[in-house]
């Protein structure tokens, strides 16, 4: 199943209830290099909380969890350049062979881009390495 590699139930237990109530919460941080939880992160109550990530708009969360849904679009070339700069050539190979195709299949299967009211188009890295 596209997007099936995420533990949505844990998100529903640890994060969603507090988001709905505007309360502080803690969640377990998953370390993909160890394939295990690696501590917790505390999130204070705030007037605005951003939930980001490739799978954060899965239909599992279509029950009014978010006030605004935004899609961050990036060209394949810019995406690969950023992965290479951030993670190195070996990781880029893994991303190209596994993670990018999985994310693309998920986004297409569930119409993620089309379900968003806001589209943010990434710009290529500038001379200073800055990007939007």
Predicted regions mapped to residue ranges:
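A short acidic, glycine-rich active-site loop
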Residues: 1-6, 93-101
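Short, intrinsically disordered, mixed-charge
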Residues: 17, 85-88
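Short, basic, glycine/proline-bearing loop/turn elements
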Residues: 22-25, 90-95
């Amino acid at each position: 199943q596209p997007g099936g590699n995420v533990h949505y139930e844990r998100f529903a237990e640890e994060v969603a209830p507090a988001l709905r109530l505007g309360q502080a919460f803690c969640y377990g941080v998953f370390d993909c290099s160890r394939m295990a939880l690696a501590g917790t992160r505390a999130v204070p109550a705030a007037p605005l909380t951003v939930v980001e990530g490739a799978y954060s708009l899965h239909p599992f969360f279509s029950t009014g969890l978010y006030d605004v849904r935004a899609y961050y679009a990036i060209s394949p070339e810019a995406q690969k350049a950023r992965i290479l700069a951030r993670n190195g050539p070996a990781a880029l190979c893994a991303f190209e062979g596994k993670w990018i195709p999985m994310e693309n299949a998920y986004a297409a299967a569930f119409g993620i881009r089309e379900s968003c009211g806001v589209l943010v188009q990434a710009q290529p890295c500038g001379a200073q390495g800055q990007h939007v």
